[in-house]
Amino acid sequence: VTAQWIDIPTGNDTFGGYLALPKRGKGPAVIIIQEIFGVNSHIRAVADQYAADGFVALAPDVFWRTQPRVELTYEGADRDKGIELMKKTDVGLAVADIGTAADALRARPEVAGKVAAIGYCFGGQLAYRAAAAAKVDAAVAYYGGGIQNALDLAGKITQPILFHYAENDHGIPLDAVEQVKAAFAGRQNASFHLYPGAEHGFNCTDRASYNQRASALAHGRTLTFLAEHV
């Protein structure tokens, strides 16, 4: 895997993104959308993992308009800072930035195939919104917070979309999961998986809530989903 930060032009400005390339050079593309903690070492590791799986992976800096290249840990003051940055983020502009990142990927010679978004936590909601805005060809939302408050967008999503939820997520109660499921009832493009005993952030090896079984299972399901749709 070859990885580096790149500049992505947007209007008269640029924002950063962490780009990880597969060893074979070419592949379909995934946009890895950060949590509230920035494109930190864990998100970069996720991009590297997908590059090792043969994808061109790009993790755009979602918070660049407020504070570029922020790198936060998961507790205390860093967590408070992440919540503050999320609240300052214009979701519409963030989705537009994801679209810009997708276009940047499509223009790269290494990208052969479609572009999917995989988002975690706040990034899961952004992946959902990016699909609704037709910015990506498929989307995966890991414990996407707030999706239940944006169900007016569900009807706009015609692309394949995969939802991973944790059974014991204090931020996303099971009734919220049921609301999202109900919005996609009878639709063939949406898949849902609930992970028993898992908590919010179960995919992150740097968090106390990391759950190896749920993480491995969700990663396998995501790879199968990507193999079918990108």
Task: Tell me the role of every PLM-derived stretch.
Residues V1-V230:
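N-terminal cap/leader regions of alpha/beta-hydrolase-fold enzymes
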